[in-house]
């Protein structure tokens, strides 16, 4: 079944536009995705990523000439006949990992987050790096803790703008936190008991969007691999 997506990001208030005000409601993709079935959520994520790619890749990276959409928007072609380079949507690989030590898990807070907002650690995969290597490196860079027993859990597209999140569990070899880089304002250990109420609430909402929340909840409820 064909599906179509239209980028309206250039319109400040689309709900007031004469041609759109009767089209329905407009809302943030992160909010609506919480209430969508998995199939619709995936379609929405794909549409968002493709639209953003077209918006930010209007010129050929090889010769600088304009490029134009082809193949229903799944490819862009350089308009320079001497170049004729095909360009395809990019996907940035990132790892996100829940690191535990016995009955505790380490969560961090970014500097721009509210003081009560914490999440598991994450970071991008470097060129030429294995995803397992990225997991170990990011944990060491962010909290200075060596890890072992790295286990893959699942993946999730995160089109803000074009990430693919790869989720892992791992075990800490030390509980001494040493924030090395400047990404985190703080990091600390949380017990299962501290996270239990939120985990139970998540279990009642299986379509909830965040892979971070899924990993935390499954670990808290004891269903990790």
Predicted regions and their residues:
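The catalytic Nudix box helix
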Residues: 119-154, 168, 174-176
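Nudix hydrolase/Nudix homology domain
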Residues: 1-57, 68-70, 114-118, 180-225
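Non-heme Fe(II)/2-oxoglutarate
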Residues: 164-187
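Cys/His-rich short segments
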Residues: 45-98
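Conserved hydrophobic/aromatic beta-strand scaffold that supports enzyme active sites
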Residues: 5, 59, 77, 96-98, ...
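Acidic pyrophosphate-coordinating catalytic loop
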Residues: 156-165
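N-terminal strand-loop-strand
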Residues: 76-119, 124, 146-147
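Short acidic-glycine loop/turn motifs at beta-strand connectors
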Residues: 1, 101-103, 174
